[in-house]
Curated annotation (Swiss-Prot):
It comes from the Eukaryota. The gene is ARHGEF4. GO terms for cellular component: cytosol; ruffle membrane. This is Rho guanine nucleotide exchange factor 4. The keyword Cytoplasm applies. Residues 113-145, 257-282 are annotated as: Disordered. SMART domains: PH, RhoGEF, SH3. SUPFAM superfamilies: DBL homology domain (DH-domain), PH domain-like, SH3-domain. It comes from Homo sapiens. Residues 194-253 form the SH3 domain.
Length: 690
């Protein structure tokens, strides 16, 4: 937006000098400006009088006169006032094709209203090109409820669609939560009008707080209040409470026709009603397809920002980041970016622009099904990335560097760990999108079978990734448990095992004296560990041995006299190895306990076979890191109860006191997955009891 000369006579030089001296080079008051200011100040102190060489390609700025500064300040105040008025005028409901749209003014960044930048030496922790950074001017556009602009309305004002897309996402996209920008206004308007707004849970929200709403991944939540950006008030069944807005995905079609509203057959009006209902269903399918394409474009832009804004800048600073650190922080996100670009290109080719509801997108998901499995590696590495980022951000130079990278790429105000969480969120969102697409796809549609198969395939991919993620989270718990066992012998448990299947107290009958011993048994994949309880301190366990489950046969024994040991047995079973003839007789106190153990042995064999088929394994680095973490956390006396894994999202509740403990919530889950028995089993271990 070009500057305009103010009407009237320009003030005298003395007046302009007075205005200039009243505000001498003030620090910017916004967070992004503060970081840039800090970077420039640090670099100025670092060089200590050395004249920096002018970077190639950067034009020298001409001196700024006092009169120019006064004019610029006057125009800045005028623009700020005008922007404030325009925002009030343009925020309002606009109806188009029966869909509520919202006029949303994208306010010019305050940084573009500051004084012109002078030539400053760059900080040693600043990414290259920081002095090229500037904020483009934006014009108001029409924002749809999903945050996408209506390009038809403002194409003439803004320019090309590509420029419009880049400008939009440099200022107002909403990766962190679904209620960004105009979407939040639309939600509250619908709620105030009495409409029912529904959202689908992306992940489990597990909470012990009676003011928060717990739900499972895939549950449908009625949003009752969305005035807060981070926490919404909702209802599931008979329960109401607060829940994180980032944990849900708003349904594309909120006003769905009820089944009982279908027209009655037998007259011409019914035929017209049937055609109208089909047209409505086609429109809803169009909405879902548009959402899939829109979110994919957003996601590609997001991945490009990470790869170009962070990864590329970090590689230029070999003095700050090693290759191993970069692999830990960013994982294989560049591979994901390449695969997603090919996937989006395939979606665009199959998109019917004239009649979007006839688009056939299911085949695209099937063709790229194998490519989506690379998300497994990324999701498995993400906890390590969080740990490494937490360690680096304790140093101020890394905080400044990451913030400067974000500013240079013109990304929204979210920390790097928040950006890196998006691929994990994305892979969990595909099954929900495909399920909604299948819902509005007629069985006679050419895309019906492909969408149905794609939904099944993406559920399997998400389930596989979720299972691997859960297993990797368990290894820290297993390492901590092993470190609490006294007199441990032999190799570490994690060398062969990664999950606790079952645990409990059994009576072990030894040969040849047929002596009975009470022992605590812990069944892991590939091995069975047994320990002895301390006579005085029952929470202390002593290692006594282990059995290799590979090659062992579990034999169910009837009550009566054992032929080998010649003793009476009850609720017993035998672990027998045919190759060596080794035999171990174990007894439970109750028949139901025996049945649970027999089922646990069957699950252990199934788990081992599944790991072999899927190629799941724990790397040497992961084992060493888990054992190192366990050694650091080991304390004398009774170990404290272990909380949930580090791969968690912590949210601040707006309606609760700030000193209240924040509830940890697992952020990776598959809708309606089979409940894990790990937490139930691990709670039975003595070190994890309170």
């Amino acid at each position: 937006m070009p500057w305009e000369e103010p009407a009237g006579e320009k003030p005298s030089c003395s007046h302009s000098q007075k205005a200039f001296h009243m505000e001498p080079a003030q620090k910017p008051c916004f967070t992004t400006d503060m970081v840039t200011w800090a970077l420039l100040c640090i670099s100025a102190e670092t060089v200590r009088g050395e004249a920096p060489s002018q970077p190639r390609g950067i034009p020298h700025r001409s001196p700024v006169s006092v009169d120019d500064l006064w004019l610029e300040k006057t125009q800045r105040k005028k623009l700020q006032k005008q922007a404030h008025v325009e925002r009030r005028l343009h925020i309002g409901a606009v109806h188009k094709d029966g869909v509520k749209c919202w006029r949303k003014t994208i306010i010019t960044s305050p940084e573009s209203l500051n004084l012109p930048r002078r030539s400053h030496p760059l900080s040693q922790s600043a990414p290259t090109g920081l002095n090229h950074m500037g904020w483009p001017e934006h014009t108001p556009g029409t924002a749809m409820p999903d945050g996408a602009l209506d390009t038809a309305v403002c194409a003439d004002e803004v320019g090309s669609e590509e420029d419009l897309y880049d400008d939009l996402h440099s200022s107002s996209h909403h990766y962190s939560h679904p209620g960004g920008g105009g979407e939040q206004l639309a939600i509250n308007e619908l709620i105030s009008d009495g409409s029912v707004v529904c959202a689908e849970a992306l992940w489990d929200h597990v909470t012990m707080d009676d003011q928060e709403l717990g739900f499972k991944a895939g549950d449908v939540i009625e949003v009752m209040d969305a005035t807060n950006r981070e926490w919404w008030w909702g209802r599931v069944a008979d329960g109401e409470g607060w829940f994180p807005a980032s944990f849900v995905r708003l349904r594309v079609n909120q006003d769905e026709p009820a089944d009982d509203d279908a027209p009655l057959a037998g007259n011409s009006g019914a035929e017209d009603g049937g055609a109208e209902a089909q047209s409505s269903k086609d429109q809803m399918r169009t909405n879902v397809i548009n959402e899939i394409l829109s979110t994919e474009r957003d996601y590609i832009k997001h991945l490009r920002d990470i790869c170009e804004g962070y990864v590329r800048q970090c590689r230029k600073r070999a003095d700050m980041f090693s290759e191993e650190q970069l692999r830990t922080i960013f994982g294989n996100i560049e591979d994901i970016y390449r695969c997603q670009k090919a996937f989006v290109k395939a979606l665009e080719q199959r998109f019917n622009r004239e009649r979007p509801h006839l688009s056939e997108l299911g085949a695209c998901f099937l063709e790229h099904q194998a490519d989506f499995q690379i998300y497994s590696e990324y999701c498995n590495n993400h906890p390590n990335a969080c740990v490494e980022l937490s360690r680096l951000t304790k140093l101020s130079k890394y905080v400044y560097f990451f913030e400067a990278c974000r500013l240079l790429q013109k990304m929204i105000d979210i920390s790097l760990d928040g950006f890196l969480l998006t691929p994990v969120q994305k892979i969990c969102k595909y099954p929900l999108q495909l399920a909604e697409l299948l819902k509005y796809t007629h069985p006679q549609h050419r895309d019906f079978k492909d969408v149905e198969a794609a939904l099944h395939a993406m559920k399997n991919v998400a389930q596989l990734i979720n299972e691997r993620k859960r297993r990797l989270e368990n290894i820290d718990k297993i390492a901590q448990w092993q470190s609490s066992i006294e007199d441990w012998e032999g190799e570490d448990l994690l060398v062969r095992s990664s999950e606790l299947i079952y645990s409990g107290e059994l009576t072990r009958v030894t040969q040849p004296q047929a002596k009975s011993q009470q022992r605590m048994f812990f069944l892991f994949d590939h091995q069975l560990i047994y320990c002895k309880k301390d006579l005085l301190r029952r929470d202390v366990l002593y290692y006594k041995g282990r059995l290799d489950m590979d090659g062992l046969e579990v034999v169910d024994l009837e009550d009566g006299k054992d032929r080998d040991l010649h003793v009476s047995i009850k609720n017993a079973f035998r672990l027998h190895r045919g190759a060596t003839g080794d035999s171990h007789l174990l007894c439970t106190r109750k028949p139901e306990q025996k049945q649970r153990w027999l089922k646990a042995f069957a699950r252990e064999r199934e788990q081992v076979q599944l790991d072999q088929e899927t190629g799941f394994s724990i790397t040497e680095l992961q084992r060493k890191q888990a054992m190192l973490n366990a050694s650091k956390q080991q304390v004398t006396g009774k170990p404290k109860a272990v909380g949930r894994p580090c791969y968690l999202t912590r949210q601040k509740h707006p309606a609760l006191p700030s000193n209240r403990p924040q509830q940890q919530v697992l952020v990776l889950a598959e809708p309606r997955r089979k409940p894990s028995t790990f937490w139930h089993s691990i709670s039975r271990l003595a070190p994890f009891r309170k």
